[in-house]
């Protein structure tokens, strides 16, 4: 009797309720969303390319044209390349921009008026310094010695013919700069223009003890002028008209004239 009961129990079918109670074996596959591509960091400030080109980025955009960065002014091409040791004609707002070998804008010009980089009108001294740097950069090169550059500048001055643009007493307090600018503008002049132009060119290439001298006061329109560098006389007009060797780097003893006026170029 006990065996029969066991058989009956073993053959009893599973009820619907029992099947529902069995645990489910369904497997779910989870597909992960793709990771977002990381954004490239935004360029800012000075950037130098592998080819050596320098650019400046502000808010992710490269700067072009005339720009102030910090305390200095710079000029960038239409493609954002920093310009160096050049002149930009008809640039931003129609100005001409003068750029030195450090990439700084050292002056600008519109019409016949010169301005500093920040827009102030230049003095005669500032104009003479600007023009002399431009001319020295054009007629000399880095392979020349300092003395070779000096003689090249002297030769450039004496190529101009003799001409009087103003009387000596019309030069103002900064008369060497005023007369130098006459020569830089026209590439000719009298003894004062020649001496002033050469003096500013000498300063532009690195000479320190540079003076423009005259043998009479400024009210004397018959005065003669020359340049003095480190105590030696350089007289462009006399070198051209009389003797090059005698008036290039002469001593005062051999020169024969002595200064009544002496203006330091600075």
Descriptions of predicted regions:
Residues 122-132, 153, 257-258, 262-266:
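Non-catalytic ligand/cofactor/substrate-binding and regulatory segments of enzyme domains
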Residues 16-18, 80, 132, 136, ...:
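Small-side-chain structural scaffolding
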Residues 196-259, 266:
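Hydrophobic/aromatic-rich core segments of domains that either
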Residues 149-153, 187-202:
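Active-site nucleophilic cysteine motif
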Residues 43-49, 65, 178-180, 192-197:
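A generic short-segment signal for beta-strand/edge and adjacent turn/coil regions
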Residues 126-183:
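Secondary-structure boundary elements
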Residues 81, 158, 162, 232:
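Residue-level marker of positions within ordered structural domains that often coincide
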Residues 2, 8-127, 169, 213-230:
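Extracellular adhesion/carbohydrate-binding repeat motifs centered on closely spaced tryptophans
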């Amino acid at each position: 009797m006990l065996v029969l009961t066991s058989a009956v129990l073993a053959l009893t079918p599973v009820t619907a309720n029992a099947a529902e109670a069995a645990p489910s074996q369904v497997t779910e596959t989870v597909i992960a969303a793709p990771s977002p591509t990381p954004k490239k960091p935004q360029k800012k400030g000075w950037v130098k390319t592998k080819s050596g080109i320098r650019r400046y980025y502000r808010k992710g955009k490269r700067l072009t044209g005339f720009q102030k960065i910090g305390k200095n002014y710079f000029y960038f091409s239409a493609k954002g390349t920093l310009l160096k040791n050049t002149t930009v004609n008809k640039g931003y707002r129609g100005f001409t921009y003068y750029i030195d070998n450090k990439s700084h804008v050292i002056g600008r010009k519109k019409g016949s008026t010169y301005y500093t980089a920040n827009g102030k009108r230049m003095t005669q001294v500032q104009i003479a310094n600007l023009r002399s740097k431009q001319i020295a950069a054009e007629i000399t090169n880095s392979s020349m010695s300092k003395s070779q550059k000096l003689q090249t500048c002297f030769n450039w001055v004496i190529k101009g013919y003799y001409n009087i643009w103003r009387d000596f007493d019309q030069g103002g307090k900064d008369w060497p700069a005023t007369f130098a600018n006459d020569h830089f503008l026209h590439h000719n002049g009298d003894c004062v223009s020649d001496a002033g132009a050469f003096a500013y060119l000498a300063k532009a290439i690195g000479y320190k003890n540079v003076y423009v001298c005259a043998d009479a006061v400024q009210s004397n329109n018959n005065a003669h002028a020359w340049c003095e560098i480190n105590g030696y006389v350089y007289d462009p007009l006399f070198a051209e008209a009389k003797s090059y060797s005698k008036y290039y780097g002469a001593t005062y003893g051999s020169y024969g004239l002595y200064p009544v006026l002496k203006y330091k170029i600075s």
